[in-house]
Amino acid sequence: MKVINARNVNDALLLGLDLFQDPRNFREQESRNGTTYEALEPVTTVYNKPWERVMLVKLRDANPFFHFIEGLWMLAGRNDLKPLTYLLKSMEDFSDDGETLWGAYGYRWKSYFHKDQIKLVIEMLKANPDDRRCVLQMWDANKDLNRRGKDVPCNTTIYFKIRDKKLNMTVCNRSNDMLWGAYGANAVHMSMLQEYIASHLRVQIGTYRQVSDSFHVYHNELWERVKGLEIDPWTYSDIKNPYDLLEGTVYTNF
């Protein structure tokens, strides 16, 4: 198990790229979507400030507005495609019927299993802040296992617990594209979920851990663009901790 201990998603990106600089850490692996470089063992990313969720590395060229809207769409428990394709038409590529997303996380959080799992987690932790049974499920073995659709959930399970009056969250992921998934959409969506639940519990946001079983990057234009970034505290200090440069920004942690 490799552990990437990061301040935020920007920090994690540079540390993740550093992992793929050493050929002893990865192998070339074919996939249904093309050739990847895959870490030889699972990777856990630890975010110590998960609320610093916006990717500010210019070469990554992430769209924080779309990620934020998609995060709200998830918290609303929706699976309809139209609100997303209005902003990003290519989301249609992940739909089997052109109208919905099969693996929509928010829908699975709030409706798919015939219960609002988010509400239950909040109620459980309000009743017992020491509870260790707060498991939010996204993977349905009855329908997802051996399914050949376009959108099978990559994130499978989320665990919540309160320690030292902070809400910690661990997300388990079967397959994680480092650039588009782990340090793109996942860092935004899951930290928004953590913040939402913490706000209802009136506790601080703790650590967010993302456990990625298959941690990989695809051989594509984005990889070619960012792979040369290196961890250099003098050259890339403005990239590694960009939030230090946001003068006057105040974050209120409950």
Residue ranges and their predicted role:
Residues 1-254:
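Terminal, non-catalytic protein-protein interaction segments that mediate quaternary/complex assembly
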